[in-house]
Regions:
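Extended polybasic, low-complexity segments that bind anionic RNA or targeting/receptor surfaces
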Residues: 1-43, 88-208
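Glycine/serine-rich anion-binding loops at beta->alpha junctions
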Residues: 49-87
Length: 208
């Protein structure tokens, strides 16, 4: 039986490609790719100063002998208030390298989950002007739950401006569409103006 998605705002249904929307999901791979996406978004700008970077502390705080206290050479050691931090966080990249083919497969798995649950739809993408009420009317016809991810071809077209003000809705281009966003969405609405056959999403830029 062919996989199909409703033509939201139009008539009939759009046939989905089995190679993209009929993939058996694997939880471990989806988890790995979501973790990689989240890790890559981390800025990694956290920083602490070591004892060699903090200001002051040049003078010996007290004499070497005769005080009964442990010898100290500076007040900027880690045991003093205002001293440096031992093994504190330093700027670093949290990016996780993933196999490109595995990532594309995980994205197809995520799309297949939407196809299996009938939560993916296709619309013609032709908005005469940016109107949020038109986007609301289109979603009302579909009767799907949010959060909603709308996949478009151009972030500057009228459809993008129409959908982006809706609560619990995210507008993404095909290049921006990631595994986490697909799994986060309870509904996925794809513009028919995206390059390629409407609803196939083979063109999730696999040629790049």
């Amino acid at each position: 039986m062919a996989l199909q998605a409703p033509n939201v705002g139009g008539k009939g249904k759009v046939t989905l490609q089995e190679a993209v929307f009929g993939v058996e999901p694997r939880e471990s791979l989806l988890h790995e790719m979501v973790r990689a996406e989240q890790a890559s978004r981390r800025q990694g700008t956290h920083a602490t100063k070591t004892r060699g970077e903090v200001a002051g502390g040049r003078a010996k705080p007290f004499r070497q002998k005769g005080t009964g206290r442990a010898r100290q050479g500076t007040t900027r050691a880690a045991q003093f208030a205002g001293g440096g931090v031992v093994f504190g966080p330093q700027p670093r990249s949290y990016a996780v390298k993933v196999n490109r083919k595995a990532y594309l497969k995980a994205r197809r798995m995520a799309l297949s989950l939407h196809a299996a649950s009938d939560s993916i739809g296709v619309f013609d993408g032709a908005f005469d002007a940016p109107r949020t009420k038109d986007a609301i009317a289109l979603i009302a016809k579909w009767r799907q739950d949010r959060p909603l991810v709308v996949v478009i071809d151009d972030a500057e077209d009228a459809a993008a401006y129409s959908f982006r003000n809706l609560p619990k809705s995210v507008v993404l281009t095909v290049d921006e569409l990631g595994v986490e966003a697909i799994l986060w969405a309870r509904s996925l609405l794809v513009s028919g103006s995206v390059p390629g056959a409407p609803g196939s999403l083979v063109y999730v830029r696999e040629d790049r």
